[in-house]
Amino acid sequence: MSKILLVQPNRWGRGITSIWIPSHIGILRSHNHDVKLFDCTFYKNWAEHEIEFNTENQQYQPTDYQKKIKFNDNDIFQEFQKVIDEFKPDIIFWSALSSHIHGEGEYVNIQYGNMLIEKIITNAKKIAGGLQPTAEPENMMKRFPNIDYFIRGESEVVLAEIADKLEQ
């Protein structure tokens, strides 16, 4: 059994569950892997407060949504390192797929995940998937050399196969 830490590197400060998360968890668990999720969405020192920004520039109607959110005051990098130290993952995976209403949120998730892993200490394999690696794999390898593997296309099954191989 491999240990896989899935990371949701969302910085937009709003809770939209990415469709890739439950599909990956389901397939990985069906292969008897131990899976944990680290969700970055509501860390105060990470969130970009996209709703406030888009309300100010009149893309969104004013709401009281921000008042209903409880942000985590802990340092995201320390929390991430703590989860890694305690869980001891074999693989850290994040994706840029179906994460937000706006396309820009999908494309920057590889970059956001990379920003997180650059500041942590781990021996885990770092793997990313989604739109960017599928569309331009060579560019991803050049831009993010500290990511060990990129998965093109649908990554659920491929990630499970990689995890299966790691445990052999």
Predicted stretch roles:
Residues 2-3, 34, 50, 94:
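Generic N-terminal initiation segments characterized by hydrophobic and/or small/turn-forming residues
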Residues 45-74:
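Charged, often glycine-rich, active-site loop that binds/positions anionic groups
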